[in-house]
Regions:
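Stable alpha-helical elements in mature extracytoplasmic
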Residues: 30-34, 38, 46-50, 81-84, ...
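Second-shell loop/turn segments in exported
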Residues: 23-28, 37-41, 63, 67-68, ...
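Amphipathic alpha-helical interaction surfaces
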Residues: 56-59, 83-86, 114
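Secondary-structure transition/hinge residues
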Residues: 42, 88-89, 116
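Catalytic cores of secreted/periplasmic lytic hydrolases that degrade extracellular macromolecules
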Residues: 13, 19-20, 25, 114-129
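Secretory-pathway/luminal and periplasmic proteins that interact with or process carbohydrate-rich
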Residues: 58-65, 115-120
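Substrate-binding/active-site groove segments that recognize
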Residues: 70-90
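Export/targeting segments at the very N-terminus of extracytoplasmic proteins
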Residues: 1-60
Length: 129
């Protein structure tokens, strides 16, 4: 877990790295309530990235719904799209819906460890490096 941006930047001259660190830290702080759940499903080295994705995708709101121009919706903490969820539901034998934070986090970790982080590339400008 990141303790302080001042401990991770080598010199004060590297202000852009400090700003980037602070932005990431603020993103993680907003969604701290979800940390125990994320820690349950993600490897320790992936927890902060997962927390940033939750911030960028839904601002930590498990009831978030994003409507797309093609008529589909992105739903829940991880903003799973209708098409993605339709594909995953039978594959993973999912019983709950995308609004269920535990289910969507478990599915997100399955996707990451079986297929990579690219499923959230549309928001990578927010969470990625």
């Amino acid at each position: 877990m990141l303790i302080s941006c001042t401990l991770t930047t080598e010199t004060p001259a590297d202000f852009s790295q400090f700003i980037s660190c602070r932005k990431g830290q603020q993103q993680v702080n907003v969604v701290q309530d979800w940390r125990p759940l994320v820690e349950k499903y993600f490897k320790p080295q992936d927890v902060d990235r997962a927390m940033r994705i939750i911030f960028c995708e839904s601002s930590g709101r498990s009831n978030a719904v994003g409507k797309n121009t093609n008529g589909t919706k992105d739903v829940g903490l991880w903003q799973f799209n209708d098409e993605t969820w339709r594909w995953l539901k039978p594959k993973l034998k999912i019983q709950d819906d995308r609004f269920d934070a535990e289910t969507s986090t478990a599915v997100a970790s399955w996707l990451v460890y079986n297929d990579g982080w690219f499923h959230w590339n549309s928001s990578k400008h927010c969470w990625g490096k």
